[in-house]
Amino acid sequence: MVAKILDGKQIAKDYRQGLQNQVEALKEKGFTPKLSVILVGNDGASQSYVRSKKKAAEKIGMISEIVHLEETATEEEVLNELNRLNNDDSVSGILVQVPLPKQVSEQKILEAINPDKDVDGFHPINIGKLYIDEQTFVPCTPLGIMEILKHADIDLEGKNAVVIGRSHIVGQPVSKLLLQKNASVTILHSRSKDMASYLKDADVIVSAVGKPGLVTKDVVKEGAVIIDVGNTPDENGKLKGDVDYDAVKEIAGAITPVPGGVGPLTITMVLNNTLLAEKMRRGVDS
């Protein structure tokens, strides 16, 4: 069998059209979602990613701004800018682009974001709400993964799902989302023993560790669904996933490519959460 290719670009395009329709409906009520992104320093990858978010937001009718601070900005300066955005009623959602310079505590900054504007879903309050099944902002990559699975009509109930990676950004939250869909979830990590035995029994594999070639054909069950979150540049700058794509697609039931799989959905869910933030604070039903 040859796997169905889960085209994240097309899924994202369709989803963004739905978001655009909702933004237009919200504007008719007098409300326009606004996304503000704080960028500290001149890291090329961060600048490119932030510009992509701004462009995507504006394309569906949102307002977006980049607040660019110098590489030498102090923690206090970043906190002051963040506090201004927290108190600005025109701002629906706030993102702080990471990594931050070494003189700025990432944790302190993320905890200073107003939880009601935390569209990355990284604030401890929002993480806690996710784990007690309250409505909240869910981290964008896990949310995008779930949309891919939904779009592909993957029934997760009772299925064995293996998540490789335990980060607070992807591994742990996507495990919780899979649990909410009644999957039986196993989390593997760098200290796990005999990973192959778990992978061979998995109906769904989500790999998010940034190790090219980690998931090989010999550990994948025929017909399994493979979600590859890895995006490690090789020596030529080409992005590589965690999965041996060419070999695994010959046996998997469905698979995401890299690039063009999960990535487009991550930015899409930033927009989704910004829209949700505006609706929640204006008392508009989702």
Swiss-Prot record:
The protein's matches in InterPro entries, at most eight in alphabetical order, are given as: Aminoacid_DH-like_N_sf, NAD(P)-bd_dom_sf, THF_DH/CycHdrlase, THF_DH/CycHdrlase_cat_dom, THF_DH/CycHdrlase_NAD-bd_dom
Q: Name one Pfam family in it.
A: THF_DHG_CYH
Query: Which Gene3D superfamilies did the record assign?
Result: Leucine Dehydrogenase, chain A, domain 1, NAD(P)-binding Rossmann-like Domain
Metabolic or biological pathway, per its Swiss-Prot or TrEMBL entry: One-carbon metabolism; tetrahydrofolate interconversion
Q: Name one GO cellular component term.
A: cytosol
Q: Where are the transmembrane segments?
A: none
Molecular function GO labels: methenyltetrahydrofolate cyclohydrolase activity; methylenetetrahydrofolate dehydrogenase (NADP+) activity
Q: Which residues bind NADP(+)?
A: G165, R166, S167, S190
Query: Which reactions are catalysed by this chain?
Result: (6R)-5,10-methylene-5,6,7,8-tetrahydrofolate + NADP(+) = (6R)-5,10-methenyltetrahydrofolate + NADPH; (6R)-5,10-methenyltetrahydrofolate + H2O = (6R)-10-formyltetrahydrofolate + H(+)
By sequence similarity, the record places it as follows: Belongs to the tetrahydrofolate dehydrogenase/cyclohydrolase family.
Its quaternary organisation is: Homodimer.
Role noted for this protein = Catalyzes the oxidation of 5,10-methylenetetrahydrofolate to 5,10-methenyltetrahydrofolate and then the hydrolysis of 5,10-methenyltetrahydrofolate to 10-formyltetrahydrofolate.
Q: Which PANTHER family match?
A: C-1-TETRAHYDROFOLATE SYNTHASE, CYTOPLASMIC, C-1-TETRAHYDROFOLATE SYNTHASE, CYTOPLASMIC-RELATED
Q: Which HAMAP family match?
A: THF_DHG_CYH (MF_01576)
This one is known as Bifunctional protein FolD
Species whose genome carries this gene: Staphylococcus aureus (strain bovine RF122 / ET3-1)
For this protein's source organism, the top of the classification is: Bacteria, Bacillati, Bacillota, Bacilli, Bacillales
- Annotated gene: folD
